[in-house]
UniProtKB/Swiss-Prot annotation:
GO terms for molecular function: structural constituent of virion. Residues 1-20, 73-80 are virion surface. This is Membrane protein. Keywords: Glycoprotein, Host Golgi apparatus, Host membrane, Host-virus interaction, Membrane, Transmembrane, Transmembrane helix, Viral envelope protein, Viral immunoevasion, Viral matrix protein, Virion. Belongs to the betacoronaviruses M protein family. Component of the viral envelope that plays a central role in virus morphogenesis and assembly via its interactions with other viral proteins. Residues 42-51, 102-222 are intravirion. It comes from the Viruses. It is a multi-pass membrane protein. Disulfide bonds: none annotated. The keyword Transmembrane applies.
Length: 222
């Protein structure tokens, strides 16, 4: 004896659901594609800012979703996974804030809360220190000056001549400060050059931030 009764969704309901949600899904997928492909400072800064804002929101949203799943569990197994995911998300979010505050105390820059990286490059330039995020750790960094405009990794850092560039730049991390010494300056044409800095030492120091009003030292929390 066979049971021919099956719990299936009627085809018209499936087609109706696809018609209702197809446009919304396509918009969401397009939005994600644009963020992933164009969300870089060297391509489109407004999209990159939106991408960073979404990254900031993902941690609290994931924690809230896990807590909600623990309060209203489907079963005991789902309750256990919800508690585990909530704890993992909370620990990782706390770790992010600890690293960000350590980097803030080392550099004094709001870029320390950048969710995409925990490294900041610091360039003493014409009486001030320019700080920007850097994604990858490398034994050498390169700057490009085009007609007096200093560029690095998609960022425009300001206007200067090749002779205004410092001999030393630093890259700060939560647990260390890396020093880079200028190793090559290749002048191309008027007020344009390529400059290469090579890492030569690592230490546990503060970043000295110079401004037009005087010298300021960022406090460091070990």
């Amino acid at each position: 004896m066979s049971n021919n009764c099956t719990n299936t969704v009627p085809r018209p309901e499936v087609i109706a659901a696809l018609k209702d949600w197809n446009f919304a899904v396509s918009v969401i997928l397009l939005f994600i594609t644009v963020l992933l492909q164009w969300g870089y400072p060297s391509r489109c800064k407004p999209i990159w800012v939106i991408k960073m804002f979404i990254l900031w929101l993902l941690w609290p949203l994931s924690i809230a979703a896990a807590v909600f799943a623990a309060i209203h569990p489907i079963n005991s197994v789902a309750f256990g996974f919800a508690i585990a995911f909530a704890c993992i998300s909370g620990i990782m979010w706390l770790s992010y804030f600890i690293s960000s505050f350590r980097l803030l105390c080392r550099t004094g820059s709001a870029w320390s809360f950048m969710p995409e990286t925990d490294m900041l490059i610091n360039i003493p330039l014409l009486g001030r220190t320019v700080t920007r995020p850097i994604i990858s750790d490398s034994p050498a960094v390169q700057f490009l000056i085009i007609r007096g405009e200093l560029r690095f990794d998609g960022f425009t850092l300001g206007r200067c001549d090749p002779g205004d560039m410092p001999d030393i730049v630093t890259i700060a991390r939560p647990n260390a400060l890396h020093w880079y010494k200028r190793a090559l300056t290749r002048n191309m044409y008027t007020r344009s050059a390529i400059l290469v800095y090579i890492k030569y030492k690592v230490g546990n120091h503060r970043v000295q931030n110079t401004t037009e009003d005087g010298d300021r030292l960022a406090m460091f929390v070990a």
